[in-house]
């Protein structure tokens, strides 16, 4: 009887794995070696890290765009993974909104690595979502959704002036992102 039960369990695990439900799509979600526990930082840095946690986990993930001013200055400079820069909170907000057009379920749920010094903070995270809506590419053209789920390891470095960031650097692997979206090999 135990042999039959074991075979049944193995079959269920194999079936679930085939559906992609049991395994992370990328090592970013399920790293072989998790990050060490967070080390307490100076009070000012801890305050900025808490603001940043709230930014990603609540404001960004729940698209509460009117609350971006809690963490970003009006004249924020944002350097994106491809190296281009945007200036101003309004421009940055529109760029963030554009990500949710093709993947309305994007979330960031944790910052496994978070630290800083003085007016600087740095966090890592995993941005997840599903490509379920057409992706606008300009001139009224779109890329049809692939239905692919993505889990992108990302990092953000922030420079703080007072209680908000005046410059934010975003890092993730765009090639890996495109592969996970099903748009490249």
Question: Where do the model's predicted regions map?
Answer:
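Bacterial N-terminal signal peptides
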Residues: 9-20
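C-terminal and inter-domain tail/linker signature
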Residues: 23-185
């Amino acid at each position: 009887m135990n042999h039959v039960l074991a075979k049944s369990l193995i079959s269920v695990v194999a079936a679930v794995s085939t559906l992609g439900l049991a395994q992370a799509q990328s090592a970013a979600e399920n790293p072989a070696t998790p990050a060490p526990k967070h080390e307490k930082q100076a009070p000012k840095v801890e305050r900025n890290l808490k603001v940043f946690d709230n930014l990603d986990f609540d404001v960004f993930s729940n698209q509460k765009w009117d609350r971006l001013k809690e963490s970003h200055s009006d004249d924020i400079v944002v350097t994106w993974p491809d190296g281009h820069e945007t200036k101003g909170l309004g421009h940055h907000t529109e760029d963030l909104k554009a990500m949710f057009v093709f993947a309305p379920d994007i979330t960031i749920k944790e910052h496994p690595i978070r630290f800083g010094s003085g007016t600087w903070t740095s966090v890592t995270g995993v941005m997840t979502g599903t490509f379920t809506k057409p992706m606008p590419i300009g001139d009224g053209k779109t890329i049809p959704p692939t239905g692919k789920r993505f889990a992108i390891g990302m990092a953000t470095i922030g420079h703080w002036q007072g209680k908000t960031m005046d410059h934010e650097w975003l890092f993730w692997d765009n090639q890996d992102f495109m592969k996970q979206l099903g748009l490249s090999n």
